[in-house]
Regions:
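Enzymes that bind and transform nitrogen-containing heteroaromatic metabolites
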Residues: 1-167
């Protein structure tokens, strides 16, 4: 399982339920990394999608604490154990790299212990955030194995990095 996230300098990921910055190259990378794969996210993240509808061309699994919560054309689970069982029984053909955790902050914190990799768009700017991703640079369980080439969009510098769990 891998996390896919866009963070600012302080590992901020969002404000008022929205991304901090929209970078076309980041959106393209996200589509490339997730199309045809399993994406896992929370209800609040779903509500930020166009029409509050699950992403097309992916297996959508939504984590919610609400036992009566349902979503058309998506699976809903209520805890990591139920999630793992669903993936093992319904989607055995998918490998670990085909399962993507895409947010929001509480889902990242809940599922990061299950992830072996993280694809991180590092934005070289600071924004006013109210949601954060754990700082992998300060976590000894993680190491950065790829620092991507610095790119720029509308005077915002960014790069695509890859972290892997140590051991």
């Amino acid at each position: 399982m891998k996390a896919i996230v866009n963070v600012d300098r302080e590992w901020g990921i969002g404000k008022d339920g929205h991304l901090l910055v929209h970078i076309p190259a980041d959106m393209k990378m996200f589509r490339t990394e997730t199309t045809g794969k399993i994406v896992i996210y929370g209800r609040k993240t779903l509500e930020t999608f166009p029409g509050a509808k699950p992403l097309k061309n992916r297996v959508n699994i939504i984590l919610s604490r609400n036992p009566s919560y349902t979503v058309e054309v998506a699976y809903v689970v209520h805890d990591p154990e139920e999630l793992m069982k669903l993936i093992e029984t319904e989607f055995p053909e998918y490998g670990r790299e085909d399962v993507c955790v895409i947010g929001g902050d509480s889902i990242y914190r809940l599922l990061l212990p299950y992830c072996s990799a993280a694809v991180v768009t590092r934005t070289e700017a600071s924004f006013d955030a109210d949601a954060w991703f754990p700082n992998l640079d300060e976590d000894p369980a993680w190491t950065c194995v790829v620092v991507g080439e610095t790119q720029e969009f509308e005077r915002i510098r960014f790069h695509f990095d890859r972290y892997e769990r140590v051991g």
